[in-house]
């Protein structure tokens, strides 16, 4: 029914996303109304370059996600008890590689190389961490990886975080290698126990304990 119009709105800080069930003209009207309200009531300017109208089947960027809809593959029972495929659409959240790349750059854990015309991510030493002790280094990497995963774990393609993890892992190995004037191969031989990278430390009672590097995967939550 084209007479039924619906609108969904979500905002985080100064970023907002509006979903409109309606026509392109409806979307243009909503955008113009928002622009006028911001200008007249709040004395703010809406950027036309950053405020886009996008078909819901195409990705819209919001808070590091690509958001779009696709046909549902879910099965359901009809009124006769027969299994049929749903004809509706479902929202999809995708973690894009641009988001991962930016975070790796923020952490100074990667650089970009171009090989055969293709962009390649390369892990690098985090030199500002070399003076930290082993436990502090592993704990810092763990906190950053867990924080990234916790935020993006709702993405439909959350296992893609493995690409982020791989770079972070080798950035940590290289940081240890630089700290001890060694090589990644020797560092892995020294610190890997039962297939997991671990560092030893003493607690307040003098007991030796081990802190493991994150290795729990990136299953969607």
Kindly label every feature range from the protein language model.
Residues 1-221:
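Non-catalytic terminal/accessory segments
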